[in-house]
Amino acid sequence: DPRRYGSYATKSYLKVKNEEAYANVFVTHFPDEERTEARPLRTAPCYDRLKALGAVFGQKFGWERANWFAPEGVPQEDHWSFRRSNYFAHIGNEVRNVTENAGLLDMSAVAKARISGPGAEAFLDHLVANKLPKKVGLVALCHALTERGGVHSEFTVQRESVTSFYLVSA
């Protein structure tokens, strides 16, 4: 599906990625495997800081995004597997830490939109299948559906005011 690629997928990028795919035709492909050619392509201002903190990156829509963080003394590299990979326990520790404390997420690579005006709520109510947040400051996970009822998109929707909503979608 060509919609998976944005303006970052230039002819030179596609040439390098095609060559990489051809060179790996007879190589075992693992779940969630990230190929290295033509990377990093797009980086957020915090990329170097995250890398220094142990980030192991993956590419999403041309953007380098931290998939997980290697603790001190652990190599910053993925070891792919059909079972649990080397990062499994580390991600579990990250989730536990964020659940019990707090976390910070680089949102540079995700789509963001503000829908505002007197018809904003009616528009979004028609667009998504879930209930919109009623109180200012509340957040809801909402889904836009296809004509056949499948999920087309997922949004985190925050009500900013009576007539304004902020949407985030990865």
Name each model feature, range by range.
Residues P2-A170:
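Glycine/proline-enriched, intrinsically flexible loops and inter-domain linkers
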